[in-house]
From Swiss-Prot:
<dbReference type="GO" id="GO:0019427">
    <property type="term" value="P:acetyl-CoA biosynthetic process from acetate"/>
</dbReference>
<dbReference type="Pfam" id="PF13193">
    <property type="entry name" value="AMP-binding_C"/>
</dbReference>
<feature type="binding site">
    <location>
        <begin position="190"/>
        <end position="193"/>
    </location>
    <ligand>
        <name>CoA</name>
    </ligand>
</feature>
<dbReference type="GO" id="GO:0003987">
    <property type="term" value="F:acetate-CoA ligase activity"/>
</dbReference>
<dbReference type="GO" id="GO:0016208">
    <property type="term" value="F:AMP binding"/>
</dbReference>
<dbReference type="InterPro" id="IPR000873">
    <property type="entry name" value="AMP-dep_synth/lig_dom"/>
</dbReference>
<keyword id="KW-0007">Acetylation</keyword>
<feature type="binding site">
    <location>
        <position position="547"/>
    </location>
    <ligand>
        <name>Mg(2+)</name>
    </ligand>
</feature>
<dbReference type="InterPro" id="IPR011904">
    <property type="entry name" value="Ac_CoA_lig"/>
</dbReference>
<comment type="similarity">
    <text>Belongs to the ATP-dependent AMP-binding enzyme family.</text>
</comment>
<feature type="binding site">
    <location>
        <position position="545"/>
    </location>
    <ligand>
        <name>Mg(2+)</name>
    </ligand>
</feature>
<dbReference type="InterPro" id="IPR025110">
    <property type="entry name" value="AMP-bd_C"/>
</dbReference>
<dbReference type="InterPro" id="IPR042099">
    <property type="entry name" value="ANL_N_sf"/>
</dbReference>
<feature type="binding site">
    <location>
        <position position="550"/>
    </location>
    <ligand>
        <name>Mg(2+)</name>
    </ligand>
</feature>
<comment type="function">
    <text>Catalyzes the conversion of acetate into acetyl-CoA (AcCoA), an essential intermediate at the junction of anabolic and catabolic pathways. AcsA undergoes a two-step reaction. In the first half reaction, AcsA combines acetate with ATP to form acetyl-adenylate (AcAMP) intermediate. In the second half reaction, it can then transfer the acetyl group from AcAMP to the sulfhydryl group of CoA, forming the product AcCoA.</text>
</comment>
<dbReference type="Pfam" id="PF16177">
    <property type="entry name" value="ACAS_N"/>
</dbReference>
<feature type="binding site">
    <location>
        <begin position="411"/>
        <end position="416"/>
    </location>
    <ligand>
        <name>ATP</name>
    </ligand>
</feature>
Length: 651
């Protein structure tokens, strides 16, 4: 097994040149520690306020926060107008790449201002006013960003629904938000083919009695045929295209609602996470500048997330634009028309900062380094990871192969609910450890606690890993302001577990090492109890993926009469690895060696693919059903439900 455990570095300090020119310096930690509220006031004052705030934080009605009290601003003005007024109107705001090869658009900040103003005027003409809700059900096209900013400009809450979601998911979100307008497209491109989108929108609306939606604004994207409801349905290019490009933004209170974003509603009613204007944009702008070290004059930033997810909101729209950065948006899948697509885009636009998910990184690993190696990726100077804990093997591969062994890599931890990144290395300061999100950002306070809310001591060398609960013990500017229409659920979901301490419970397990670095281990639900030992699925998965033949792994705990739970692993092998009769036993032995004999999987199944949601998350719940020979639960959010035929055949 020696080939699976080569001598590798345990930490990676930033290159001297990067550290010398980094936006964030070590003094930030000291400033935030000395006076946290003054620190956040300083960050907020980087925005343009029509009316200055008079109080930084009002926590008198905890857990409902008010940040930058009394201040007024317009989010869209901060993302667009002020850059044009500062003389940067000719700077590219968005390089958009459609999935069909050759389909592209470029919008400067002046172009974006005109388009957002036209859309704002069009929405006003349709009778929308501040406080209304608009549902956006679009592929990742420029109109999606324009629609979001037009809503923000008018004080209207947008509720973006991922274009891969079903009619039922869209219906639930429209009903909960009582949306007055739905913005959609005739269709979208997926894996080289046009597929209908408005048809799902029509199905969703038809299933709603006394539907709140008055109009459906339709973007022509694919040209496919569709049903049309006269009087209700309107073409974007008619309504927005004919509107005036002149519009004066109105300031809104710092706590004015900005958007709703729903977390998965596959079981029960979806949770509408509500974010507001001043606090969200402050932390969004701050984290973009410090974590990603953006230089507006020279950087080209690419966050690969769809705008249907919070990562796409914060680091695909508001973060880059409020900092005046040039960004790339790509509509399609990473393997259309072939597996070179992402690397062609990096090369084409000279992307300097690339932010993606571990799922995609592991997919690239599975495809082999020959693909990225055939492209010039030298423009990249910083890499980022988001969405789930990244295992050390994938971390190193990402840095070595995509980053050429020279770029800093920021592994960011945050949630839909936190609004912005919370735990991450600062790239010009930290000696990053593969697999660790490192430390809370300046201005953020986090703890790892036990069942009683007491802080856990750092892990010591040779001792058993102790998994605790990741909690946030101080309010932060971009925190959610509640669950739409359900304050009791907000308290119960996030604050009830440690109510006596006043901690926000993130739902993730984590541990802290002797250097104070935080290792997020995934959802607490993904912690197994084997003979009284709590073992994280993430730790076992990391041990499996560290083997030279494994591309991806998913681990679940299954019922066992002797040990309470046993570990069952599903692994996808690398394309260039030749399996043999003892592959499964070899992997079981490796896990026992890396973690503990207690962590040795009872079963290892080699499968062709893992079941994933449309957002790329592995559905361990369904793998548990397979492992325990149960009927599959809800598969509505799966990207490809047929994957279970192959998994069962392999098992």
């Amino acid at each position: 097994m020696s080939e699976s455990t080569p001598e590798v570095s345990s930490s990676y300090p930033p290159p001297a040149h990067f550290a010398e020119h980094a936006n964030a310096r070590a003094e930030l930690y000291r400033e935030a520690e000395e006076d946290r509220l003054a620190f956040w006031a300083k960050q907020a004052n980087r925005l343009s306020w029509t009316t200055p705030f008079t109080e930084v934080l009002d926590w008198s009605e905890a857990p409902f926060a008010k940040w930058f009290v009394g201040g007024e601003l317009n989010v869209a003005y901060n993302c667009v107008d002020r850059h044009v007024e500062a003389g940067h109107g000719d700077r590219v705001a968005i390089h958009w790449e459609g999935e069909p090869v050759g389909d592209r658009r470029t919008l400067t900040y002046s172009d974006l201002l005109a388009e957002v103003s036209k859309a704002a005027n069009a929405l006003t003409d349709l009778g929308l006013v501040a406080g209304d809700r608009v549902a956006i059900y679009l592929p990742l096209i420029p109109e999606a960003v324009i629609a979001m900013l037009a809503c923000a400009r008018l004080g209207i809450m947008h509720s973006v629904v991922f274009g891969g979601f079903t009619a039922a998911a869209l219906q639930a979100r429209i009903v909960d938000a009582q949306a007055k307008l739905l913005i959609t497209a005739d269709g979208q491109f997926r894996r080289g083919k046009p597929s209908p989108l408005k048809a799902a929108a029509d199905e969703a609306l038809a299933a709603i009695p006394d539907c709140s939606v008055e109009h459906v604004l339709v973007v022509r994207r694919t040209g496919i045929e569709m049903a049309w409801s006269e009087g209700r349905d309107l073409w974007w290019h008619h309504v927005v295209g004919s509107a005036s490009p002149a519009h004066t933004p109105e300031p809104f209170d710092s706590e004015h609602p900005l958007f709703l974003l729903y977390t998965s509603g596959t079981t029960g009613k979806p949770k509408g996470i509500m974010h507001t204007s001043g606090g969200y944009l402050t932390q969004c702008c701050y984290t973009m500048r410090t974590i990603f070290d953006v230089k507006p004059d020279s950087d080209v930033f690419w966050c690969t997330a769809d705008i249907g997810w919070v990562t796409g909101h914060t680091y695909g729209v508001y973060g880059p634009l409020c900092n005046g950065v040039t960004e790339v948006l790509y509509e399609g899948t990473p393997d259309t028309p072939d597996r070179h697509r992402h690397f062609q885009i990096i090369e084409k636009y000279g992307v300097t900062i690339y932010y993606t998910a571990p799922t995609l990184i592991r997919m690239f690993m599975k495809w082999g380094r020959e693909i990225p190696d055939s492209h010039d990726l030298s423009s990249l100077r910083l890499l980022g990871s988001v969405g789930e804990p990244i295992n050390p093997e994938a971390w190193r591969w990402y840095r070595d192969v995509i980053g050429g062994g020279r770029t800093p890599l920021v592994d960011t931890w945050w949630q839909t609910e936190t609004g912005s990144a919370m735990i991450s290395p600062l790239p010009g300061i930290a000696a990053a450890k593969p697999g660790s999100a490192m430390t809370p950002l300046p201005g953020i306070s986090a703890k790892i606690v036990d069942d009683h809310g007491d802080p856990l001591p750092p892990h010591t060398e040779g001792a058993q890993h102790v998994t605790g609960y990741l909690v946030l013990d101080q309010p932060w500017p971009s925190m959610l302001r509640g669950i739409w229409g359900d304050p009791a659920r907000y308290w119960h979901s996030y604050w009830s577990k440690f109510s006596d301490k006043g901690y926000y419970f993130a739902g993730d397990g984590a541990r802290i090492d002797p250097d104070g670095a935080i290792w997020v281990l995934g959802r607490i639900d993904d912690v197994m109890n084997v003979s009284g030992h709590r073992i994280s699925t993430a730790e076992v998965e990391s041990a499996l993926v560290a083997h030279s033949g494994v591309a991806e792994a998913a681990v679940v705990g299954v019922t066992d009469e002797t040990t309470t739970q046993a570990i069952c692993a599903f692994v996808v092998l690398r394309a260039n690895y030749a399996p043999h009769d003892r592959t499964a036993e070899e992997l079981r032995t490796e896990v026992a060696r890396v973690i503990s004999p207690i962590a040795r999987p009872r079963d290892v199944h080699v499968v062709p693919e893992l079941p994933k949601t449309r957002s790329g998350k592995i559905m361990r719940r369904l793998l548990r059903d397979v492992a325990e020979n149960r009927e599959l639960g809800d598969t509505s959010t799966l990207l490809d439900p047929t994957v279970f035929d192959a998994i069962r055949a392999a098992k």
